[in-house]
Amino acid sequence: MSFYNHKEIEPKWQGYWAEHHTFKTGTDTSKPKFYALDMFPYPSGAGLHVGHPEGYTATDILSRYKRAQGYNVLHPMGWDAFGLPAEQYAMDTGNDPAEFTAENIANFKRQINALGFSYDWDREVNTTDPNYYKWTQWIFTKLYEKGLAYEAEVPVNWVEELGTAIANEEVLPDGTSERGGYPVVRKPMRQWMLKITAYAERLLNDLDELDWSESIKDMQRNWIGKSTGANVTFKVKGTDKEFTVFTTRPDTLFGATFTVLAPEHELVDAITSSEQAEAVADYKHQASLKSDLARTDLAKEKTGVWTGAYAINPVNGKEMPIWIADYVLASYGTGAVMAVPAHDQRDWEFAKQFDLPIVEVLEGGNVEEAAYTEDGLHVNSDFLDGLNKEDAIAKIVAWLEEKGCGQEKVTYRLRDWLFSRQRYWGEPIPIIHWEDGTSTAVPETELPLVLPVTKDIRPSGTGESPLANLTDWLEVTREDGVKGRRETNTMPQWAGSSWYYLRYIDPHNTEKLADEDLLKQWLPVDIYVGGAEHAVLHLLYARFWHKFLYDLGVVPTKEPFQKLFNQGMILGTSYRDHRGALVATDKVEKRDGSFFHVETGEELEQAPAKMSKSLKNVVNPDDVVEQYGADTLRVYEMFMGPLDASIAWSEEGLEGSRKFLDRVYRLITSKEILAENNGALDKVYNETVKAVTEQIESLKFNTAIAQLMVFVNAANKEDKLYVDYAKGFIQLIAPFAPHLAEELWQTVAETGESISYVAWPTWDESKLVEDEIEIVVQIKGKVRAKLMVAKDLSREELQEIALADEKVKAEIDGKEIVKVIAVPNKLVNIVVK
């Protein structure tokens, strides 16, 4: 057989690995450890798509490589299985979300195993397993005990179609929900919050110690949004009321000509004049219908209403009208801003729209034309005139503190984490509310608080979750006869994914989250690979929980993930018509290398686009494995380009990878393999070992595969293959194409053992040095010959070889040699007449 029969070979080795528990995590503590983590998937009904295996293949290559290097490797997989889609499906079909989830997991697992990933399935976790979420609930009770989980009446992002509130992070820029694209409105509700803000400074500072891309670190820094400035107190004219504004530029206070409160600010109703009451009430209602993102969109038209009240500017005693406007959020800062229209573009546009005064306090611009937002010396600012920004800020803060109307302040953009969902399919929050007004956490001995099985999972309609309908589960009585009600909100999907990497370390422990010694052995995660879409939410939440567990003494490290790598996106093929509208692939036909709309006949433009069901351009890995084999899919996805690049899927590229594997198969099975080395492949073999080793370490898998191709090309030119080089090459390709490598290893090594733990090959540095060198021979200054000669020959030897060359002899025949200039390792110049 001259080709690689994947349909026979791949299932054979998958069966072998499963039967022999080949990838069971090593426990020899004398060995170094390597923990390779994938972002575990949500097991959707659609199954795996070809984007999933890209990251999984990368961690699998590293895991197989490290095993061969003698490491204990922890390479696990599990399921982030709570979440809205399963519940939505259950509501639409009447099926149990648990059954639906179990079916999806079985399908995902089948697909993953068909790709030959070296997971230790003994460590599989599932966030919906009560033995798992017992510890999610335990972490919550600890947060509650420490005052980091609390209830608050807060305006939430309510999605009527989903029957639940969602976190700020789950609202898209257009003001719709990330899941489903439904309208989001603001609505006050009793919610559980987690005090992530208590960890803001540590979450910010500890980013510096992590081997993460700067772009991801910057996204987290921006989300945390640390600002240093001052709180300034403004009194409301004619009342005993006052409000506080946080500003990063207290030095511009002399240019503050009006103030703006969030429509929800507690002072609004108290200070609004009777003449303005109706307009204010209308505006407040309109603002409540918009999401935070829609309200703060810089491009939107400025709207606002004057309250009829005035604030007093503390630095000059001037009256400043107090407005309300929806671009100010009650949840951000103090819910109030001082407007300096001369030096802030949004304030300038607002002032122009409503004819409010603009006072320049920094020189350098023309504030009648636009806000001047650069720095300049202070003007029109009394005791700050002539000062630069830094000096002016220091002086005004000292003045405010001395007068008792302000002080220096650090704030964060980060808000506390909205932790409740009004849905059924999530972890029950282990809290009981008693009729005497107290609340207590469910004792640890009673955890897990198991999610009750029910067919009635529709939202209750009251804003509570469907659990509010389950009276038997809901109502409890204390030993002293006091009645209570269980918390009906459930946890968000982020809960289970915030600590799952810890449970992999000790997944069957019934006494604690994980054993301390095992946590010490395995943490931190050495490499975490996943999509950049989780840059803020999941990674920030997991870091927060990890730091909290560090403070409790549960985990030994301050950070969970030492190195993070975001793989790029695998794009599908899309087609657009002349209007730029996308056309589904089943409406496209190819003729003479061009693409046409089946129905209209219009020629279409081909371009990469995100794979989606609607475009019918999603590639199912099952189809690829069936036609080309898992090893082809693995090699192709790693060879497409750099791991972090977004690249379009190509059937031709897939075929190229398959042809390469067939060439590898033929090389090893048809070449004569000998115990003696004739030295012909010394250099290319040692170059290949060195390059592949270094490129796997630096995650440059595409260039590693390119080097393997170089070796195959060189080896194919030789009649025979040295056995040690054949073995070494098979080991080098094993992390990329493990099924093929196992099969070829049996033909060459004949041990009957798996290749998985055979020591990784090493290279001989001395074999990388060129033994021969090319020199040029010039006659009368023109190159007449190029010769391969031994390196470092003397002038005399070089001259002798050059003059003996047949080509050179023919050129100088019948001519007198005047002089021969020989430069070792470079050239021979012959002067004749």
Swiss-Prot record:
GO terms for biological process: leucyl-tRNA aminoacylation. It is found in: Cytoplasm. A motif ('HIGH' region) lies at residues 41-52. PANTHER family: LEUCINE--TRNA LIGASE, MITOCHONDRIAL, LEUCYL-TRNA SYNTHETASE. It is an enzyme of class 6 (ligase). SUPFAM superfamilies: Anticodon-binding domain of a subclass of class I aminoacyl-tRNA synthetases (SSF47323), Nucleotidylyl transferase (SSF52374), ValRS/IleRS/LeuRS editing domain (SSF50677). The lineage of its organism: Bacteria, Bacillati, Bacillota, Bacilli, Lactobacillales. ATP binds at residue 613. Its EC number is 6.1.1.4. It comes from Streptococcus pneumoniae serotype 4 (strain ATCC BAA-334 / TIGR4). Belongs to the class-I aminoacyl-tRNA synthetase family. Pfam families: Anticodon_1, tRNA-synt_1, tRNA-synt_1_2, tRNA-synt_1g. This is Leucine--tRNA ligase. Keywords: Aminoacyl-tRNA synthetase, ATP-binding, Cytoplasm, Ligase, Nucleotide-binding, Protein biosynthesis. Its main location: cytoplasm. Disulfide bonds: none annotated. One of its GO terms (molecular function) is leucine-tRNA ligase activity. A motif ('KMSKS' region) lies at residues 610-614. It catalyses: tRNA(Leu) + L-leucine + ATP = L-leucyl-tRNA(Leu) + AMP + diphosphate. NCBIfam families: leuS_bact (TIGR00396). GO terms for cellular component: cytosol.
